[in-house]
Amino acid sequence: MSRSATIDRQTQETQINLDLTLDGCGEACIATPVPFMNHMLTLLSRHGFFDLTVKAEGDVEVDDHHTVEDLGICLGQAFVKALGDKQGIRRYGAATVPMDETLASVHIDFSGRSCLVFNMDLPKAKVGSFDVELVEEFFTAFCNHAGANVHVNLVYGRNLHHMIEGVFKAFGRALDEATGLDPRIQGVLSTKGKL
């Protein structure tokens, strides 16, 4: 059984093609008009041990918002499709990652219920040309379209780049844990019998 998905999203604001393979080795080929997101998605794939190919175009002449949000939408949809009925997955994942002076933590539950708890007090600032407030937009879009409960906690940090990078690395590791198959799990990990 191949746990993979292809998502095509075509709107008047963005055109995105995304391929995801859960049981990969962390290979990424990311081409979007938002360089900082290219970096974040590449390390997300690497630290999550899933293969990810993304080709995106967007109305970045307006700003990066639509592209970043739609990347979150597509990634969330891809996880839903790749996980299928969620038979045998661990469901929960958690990771805490240091990134130099930063410590970041992400917890996830593929419960089928969308909820984001985002405890990063980010200033209205930029890393390069990237508006850091778009990090929350990405995670909101992912949660809404993955049916996932995600808690993002920045424990501490000073450098904005390190803070965001630490969160994406922790997110990758948490995704790897939550989507991993466990032979002890018969059906789905829920007393309801369905996720």
From Swiss-Prot:
GO cellular component: cytoplasm
Enzyme Commission number(s) of this protein: 4.2.1.19
Pathway, per record: Amino-acid biosynthesis; L-histidine biosynthesis; L-histidine from 5-phospho-alpha-D-ribose 1-diphosphate: step 6/9
PROSITE patterns: IGP_DEHYDRATASE_1, IGP_DEHYDRATASE_2
Protein location: Cytoplasm
InterPro entries: IGPD_sf (IPR038494), ImidazoleglycerolP_deHydtase (IPR000807), ImidazoleglycerP_deHydtase_CS (IPR020565), Ribosomal_Su5_D2-typ_SF (IPR020568)
Reactions accelerated catalytically: D-erythro-1-(imidazol-4-yl)glycerol 3-phosphate = 3-(imidazol-4-yl)-2-oxopropyl phosphate + H2O
Major place of residence: cytoplasm
GO terms of molecular function: imidazoleglycerol-phosphate dehydratase activity
Keywords assigned: Amino-acid biosynthesis, Cytoplasm, Histidine biosynthesis, Lyase
PANTHER family according to UniProt: IMIDAZOLEGLYCEROL-PHOSPHATE DEHYDRATASE (PTHR23133:SF2), IMIDAZOLEGLYCEROL-PHOSPHATE DEHYDRATASE HIS7 (PTHR23133)
Family: Belongs to the imidazoleglycerol-phosphate dehydratase family.
Protein name per Swiss-Prot or TrEMBL: Imidazoleglycerol-phosphate dehydratase
